[in-house]
Structure formats: structure tokens, C-alpha cells
Curated annotation (Swiss-Prot):
Gene: SHE9
UniProt biased composition (Low complexity): 101-110
GO cellular component, one term: mitochondrial inner membrane
Chain intervals with Acidic residues compositional bias: 410-422
The protein's name: Sensitive to high expression protein 9 homolog, mitochondrial
Described purpose of this protein according to its UniProt entry: Required for the maintenance of the structure of the mitochondrial inner membrane. Involved in mitochondrial morphology. Causes growth arrest when highly overexpressed.
Keyword Transmembrane helix: yes
Originating species: Coccidioides immitis (strain RS) (Valley fever fungus)
Polar residues bias spans: 383-400
Keywords annotated in UniProt: Coiled coil, Membrane, Mitochondrion, Mitochondrion inner membrane, Transit peptide, Transmembrane, Transmembrane helix
Record topology, Mitochondrial intermembrane segments: 321-464
A Pfam family per the record: She9_MDM33
GO biological process: inner mitochondrial membrane organization
Membrane topology category: Multi-pass membrane protein
Coiled-coil regions listed: 179-212, 250-279
Length: 488
């Protein structure tokens, strides 16, 4: 008898399905289809399909081998349907019943096998991607790619920044009118080149005219020489005289044409030079207008900045500084009140522990008010009698002990209260020193006092007045300077 794994190896074949025979006691059975996984998946799948009842598989395998060994049985292998028909009627009827439910189970097993195959195919790729994601963040190539990406972004940003700056500069030149001046500059450069060309043509025309004059003069001189020895002419001299006489008209016409060309070249050069000078003057005029416009804009911008500074100064001095001062005073008062409350609470706790009444600490504002009231009452000459009352703790102790004799109350001698020191406000001092004499020492001392570290106390009104006077003086000085140095 074969062992169980050997039976599995002999029985489980690719694409073969077997009908599971059951005992008569079972009501219904389900057929199963066992498919061998590909060689790549056998290591993963193992005996996944062998999880069906081993007893049923063992019975099917033994029946299969008994039929094959005897050779006379009526069972045969149905390769298309993937089932076996046995010789006994019970197995055939069970196989027929199982064929009705076999398509559903076989389709389910096929779908599960397909999903497992897809998972086995996708498994290495997903694991590879996961490993790359885990190790890719720390590899030098990853950092290099990120650095190159950042450098590309930075270079693109710089290129865009340069183009944006160029476009903004061009729009600013269009608004201020400097673009027209640039066009004038280019036109002047072209006109200068044209003037150079005209001057070159003038020189060439002069050379041609001089050559024509020399050629005609030479011919006339030769004619005169021939006329002087007219009585001794030879046939060659006669032919030469006739040729010179005929060419004299052509030389005269060439001289006239060279003279006309020279005059035209000189006229064109003069026109080009005049146009160039006009362009230079117009450029100078436009540049002066542009500089005046820029100077005017800078002046108004300076005035605007001065106005903004003065406005901010006034806002800070009128609104922000008082608010900040109030906030500081409020915070200081809150801290003082908290300290006083803590001190009163500590004194009350100490008095409760000792059985004595607590002495409350009055705030400084109440103390000053009481001192002023006492001073006013002393000035009026009113003597207000003072009565001292027994402490509540003493009264309660006497009431609780009725057997003890009640001692008469002894009024303590009033201690002389110290006279409150009058609150003297610091005198307001001016920013500028007092009027000094005209001596150099006094002026030197005054100048040093202006930059000394002497503390000055002044009111808000004086500070605002000084600020406004300074702003007005600066505006007046700037107006005078602009009126003096402004170009006419």
C-alpha cells in the first residue's frame, strides 16, 4: 500500500477532476477539482488544495487504484468532465448527482486559482516596489535626483525672475519716457554710420574729380606741345593730335560728371551731418526733460515720505503713545493691587493664627486721598475726636467668659501721626537751554548741552509742538532749496 504523499503525487494531475464517492449514509456530496499549481507557486501554495477531507480522498484513491489493478471493472476515466464513473450503481448515481453541483464548485476553485496566480505574479513586483520605497529614500542617487530637481526649479525661478525684471524695467521706461530716448540713441548711431558712409563717398568723388581734371590737363598739355611744333609733324603726330582732339570732349564730359557727383556727395554729407546734429540736440533735450521729470518725481516722493513720516509720528504721539502708557500704567496698577491683595491675605492669615485683627494695607491712591483730606482738615482747624473700639476678638472672649470681671477699657494714647510729605511734581523743563550770552564759551557750552545726556521732562503738548515746528522748518528749507536750485 502506498503512502499518502505518494498517492497524492500519483493522483493529482493538472486539469484532472475526480468525483468523490460517499457512503450510502450521506445524503448529498460535492465534487471537487484539484489543480496542481505551477512550479513557481508550489513553494508558496504547498498542500493548500489538500485541505479537503483526507478520508474521502483516501477512499477515492483506493477505489481508483483497485479499478485500475483489476482491469475488469466498468469504471472509466472521463477526461473531459474530469470525473470517474465506478462499476457499482451507488457510485454512478452519486457521480450523476455530483455533476449537477460540480460546475459551481469548479468555477469557484478556478476563480480562487486565478486570484492566487495573480497574487503570485503581483507579489514580487509589489515587494520590489516596497523595497525600493524603503531603501530609495536613503540612496545617494535619490538625493542626487532631488538635488537636481531643486536646482532645476531654482534655475527656472531665476530665469523667470530675470525675465520679469526685464519686463518691469521695460514698462517703467515706457511710463517715464526713457524708451523714446533709447530709440533716439539707436537712430543717432545709425545716422553716425550714414555720415561716415557719405564722407567716404565724398572722398571717392573728390578723387575721381581730381583724376578727371588731371587727365584733361594732361591731354591739353600734350595738344599744346603738338601745336608748338606744328611745322614738323609726322603722320604719327597727326594721328595723335586728332585722337587727343576727339578725347578732349569726353574728358570734359567726365570732368563735369565727376564735379556733379562730388557736389551731390557733399550735399548728402551736409544733410546727414545736419540731421545727426538735430538728432543729438533732440536727444539732449529729451534727456533733460526726462531728468527733470525724474527729479520732480523724486522730489514729490521725498515730500510724500516726509509727510508719511510726520503722519506716523503724529499718530504714534497722539494715539499709540497714550494707549501704550495707559496700558503700562494699568498693568503696573494691576500688579500693585495683586501685591497688596497678597499682602492683605497674608496678614489676615497671620492674624487669624495669632487671634488678632488683621491690618489692611490701603492702596497708595487711597492713602494719598486720606492725607489730602487730613491736611485740609488741619488747615480748617477742625478737631475730630477719635474713638477707639475694642477688637471683636476681645469682646467675644469677654462675652464667652461671664465669670471673669470686665476690666474697664483703657484708651491708648494716640500716637502722633507723621506729617505726610507733600507730593512734589517734577518741574517741567524745556528742551532748549536758557538764553546764553554771546561769548564763545557760552555758545560752546550750549552746543555741548544740546548733545549731552541731560534728562529732560516735558509735556506731550510741548513735544508735539516741537515736532510740528521741526517738520515745518524742514519743509520750508526744502522748498527754498528746490526754488533756488531748480533748473529754469
Amino acid at each position: 500500500m502506498h503512502t499518502l504523499p505518494l498517492l497524492f503525487r500519483h493522483s493529482l494531475r493538472t486539469g484532472a477532476g475526480f468525483a468523490k464517492s460517499t457512503s450510502p449514509n450521506h445524503v448529498s456530496t460535492t465534487s471537487f477539482v484539484v489543480k496542481l499549481a505551477p512550479p513557481r507557486q508550489r513553494s508558496r501554495l504547498g498542500y493548500v488544495d489538500a485541505s479537503i477531507c483526507l478520508r474521502c480522498q483516501f477512499r477515492a484513491q483506493t477505489r481508483f487504484y483497485s479499478v485500475q489493478g483489476d482491469g475488469g471493472g466498468s469504471g472509466k476515466e472521463n477526461k473531459e468532465g474530469g470525473s470517474l464513473e465506478g462499476g457499482n450503481p451507488t457510485s454512478s448515481t452519486d457521480a450523476k448527482r455530483d455533476q449537477t453541483s460540480s460546475p459551481d464548485s469548479s468555477s469557484a476553485l478556478k476563480s480562487s486559482d486565478k486570484s492566487q496566480a495573480e497574487e503570485s505574479k503581483d507579489g514580487p513586483e509589489s515587494r520590489k516596489e516596497d523595497s525600493e520605497a524603503e531603501t530609495g529614500g536613503s540612496l545617494p542617487s535619490h538625493w542626487e535626483s532631488r538635488r537636481s530637481h531643486l536646482s532645476k526649479q531654482f534655475s527656472q525661478l531665476m530665469d523667470n525672475l530675470q525675465s520679469n525684471i526685464f519686463i518691469a524695467n521695460r514698462h517703467l521706461n515706457d511710463l517715464t519716457g526713457y524708451s523714446a530716448i533709447e530709440a533716439l540713441k539707436k537712430n543717432i548711431v545709425a545716422q553716425e554710420e550714414h555720415v561716415r558712409q557719405t564722407r567716404t563717398r565724398v572722398r571717392e568723388a573728390k578723387d575721381a574729380y581730381s583724376a578727371a581734371i588731371n587727365r584733361r590737363s594732361a591731354s591739353q598739355r600734350e595738344v599744346n606741345e603738338l601745336l608748338q611744333r606744328k611745322h614738323a609733324w609726322t603722320p604719327t603726330d597727326l594721328e595723335r593730335f586728332t585722337s587727343l582732339y576727339r578725347s578732349d570732349h569726353a574728358n570734359e564730359r567726365a570732368e563735369t560728371e565727376a564735379q556733379d557727383a562730388l557736389m551731390a556727395a557733399e550735399r548728402e554729407a551736409e544733410e546727414a551731418a545736419g540731421l545727426l546734429s538735430k538728432s543729438i540736440l533732440s536727444r539732449y533735450h529729451e534727456e533733460q526733460i526726462w531728468s527733470d521729470k525724474i527729479r520732480r518725481m523724486s522730489t514729490w516722493g521725498t515730500w510724500g515720505l516726509m509727510g508719511v513720516n510726520v503722519l506716523l509720528f503724529l499718530i504714534f504721539q497722539v494715539a499709540v503713545e497714550p494707549w501704550r502708557r495707559k496700558r503700562l500704567v494699568k498693568g503696573f496698577e494691576e500688579k500693585v493691587m495683586e501685591a497688596i491683595e497678597k499682602e492683605n491675605g497674608a496678614q489676615k492669615e497671620h492674624a487669624e493664627l495669632e487671634g488678632k485683627p488683621a491690618v489692611e494695607v490701603t492702596p497708595p491712591a487711597v492713602q494719598t486721598q486720606r492725607l489730602t483730606e487730613e491736611l485740609a482738615s488741619e488747615d480748617q482747624g477742625e478737631n475730630i475726636p477719635t474713638f477707639t473700639s475694642a477688637a471683636p476678638s476681645d469682646l467675644s472672649s469677654q462675652e464667652m467668659q461671664p465669670g471673669l470681671p470686665i476690666q474697664p477699657e483703657i484708651e491708648p494714647e494716640p500716637e502722633p501721626e507723621p506729617e505726610p510729605e507733600p507730593i512734589v511734581e517734577p518741574p517741567l523743563t524745556t528742551i532748549l537751554p536758557p538764553e546764553a550770552s554771546l561769548s564763545p564759551d557760552s555758545w560752546q557750552q550750549t552746543f555741548r548741552d544740546l548733545f549731552s545726556e541731560r534728562r529732560v521732562t516735558l509735556s506731550q503738548r510741548d513735544l508735539t509742538t516741537v515736532a510740528l515746528e521741526s517738520a515745518a522748518a524742514g519743509a520750508a528749507v526744502m522748498g527754498v532749496l528746490i526754488a533756488i536750485f531748480r533748473p529754469r
